[in-house]
């Protein structure tokens, strides 16, 4: 391809080996890659040259363990999108440690990382992270599926009391690739938190976010237009853009003020098992 497409789509069958989690600091030309090793999770930091070439600048342990979802996850051991996230201001990097049920917060200093703290994820098998301003939510994809809230401070992550919410799932620990929830993220304005449940319920769950950082007691459960909603991003007009693996389709939705998704428009990519999606 000669140009970057607005949406980048990824199918599991096109990949070989483990899919690493990647966060990119475009301003400083630094790329962060999570190794997700069960013996000890680490972040590899690369400097990116003007020609796109990467040079390893350092490796930084997270203080936790990587994890592997149940069989079927050979190309994506965490079965998710968003397991390594750079804060919008580029000053913090947050990584999940699925094998030890913890989350790590780093301070970013160019191509160097300073570990701030390692905290309990509030559930089993943390696999995805969402950040909006100083509010962080972690998706735990094992067990019933717990989303846990944190405040992001200078010294790291601090759990918000009473912020945990369950998705009411019935996964193991580790979860199965197909039934593990795929992603958590905020709407661009931070007013809602969305979770995709993949084949567990084939739904996109939408929570309201209160001014105190806590979520509504239960989400609005929206059936996906096509089966197995995996990952998502947002369009320029605020529409949800979801990758749905069951039919290898991309579907856009309007997000209502009450959390209901409407006006679905789907298009297959002509491939198999579309999983990850990213908008530049």
Can you describe what each PLM-predicted range is?
Residues 26, 64-86, 121-135, 167-191, ...:
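Beta-rich, blade/repeat-based domains predominating
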Residues 34-37, 87-88, 95-99, 138-143, ...:
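Conserved beta-strand positions in repeat-built beta-propeller and related beta-rich domains
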Residues 54-64, 114-120, 158-169, 216-223, ...:
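Beta-propeller fold detector
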């Amino acid at each position: 391809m000669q140009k970057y497409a607005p949406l980048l789509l990824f199918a599991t069958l096109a990949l070989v080996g483990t899919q690493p989690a990647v966060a990119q600091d475009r301003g400083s030309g630094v790329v962060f890659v999570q190794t997700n090793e069960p013996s000890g999770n680490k972040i590899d930091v690369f400097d990116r040259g003007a020609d796109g070439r990467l040079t390893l600048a350092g490796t930084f342990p997270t203080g936790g363990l990587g994890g592997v979802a149940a069989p079927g996850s050979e190309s994506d051991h965490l079965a998710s999108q968003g397991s390594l996230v750079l804060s919008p201001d580029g000053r913090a990097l947050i990584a999940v440690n699925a094998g030890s049920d913890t989350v790590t917060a780093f301070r970013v200093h160019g191509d160097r990382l300073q570990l701030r703290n390692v905290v309990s994820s509030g559930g089993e098998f943390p696999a995805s992270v969402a950040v909006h301003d100083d509010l962080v939510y972690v998706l735990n994809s094992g067990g019933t599926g717990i989303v846990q809230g944190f405040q992001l401070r200078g010294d790291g992550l601090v759990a918000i009391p009473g912020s945990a919410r369950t998705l009411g799932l019935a996964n193991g620990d580790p979860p199965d690739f197909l039934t593990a929830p795929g992603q958590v993220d905020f709407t661009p304005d931070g007013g809602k938190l969305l979770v995709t449940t993949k084949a567990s319920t084939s739904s996109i769950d939408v929570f309201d976010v209160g001014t105190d950082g806590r979520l509504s007691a239960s989400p609005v459960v929206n059936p996906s237009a096509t089966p197995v909603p995996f990952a998502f991003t947002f369009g320029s007009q605020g529409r949800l853009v979801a990758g749905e693996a069951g039919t290898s389709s991309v579907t856009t939705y309007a997000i209502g003020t009450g959390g209901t998704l409407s006006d679905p428009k789907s298009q297959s990519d002509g491939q198999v098992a579309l999983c990850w999606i990213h908008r530049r």
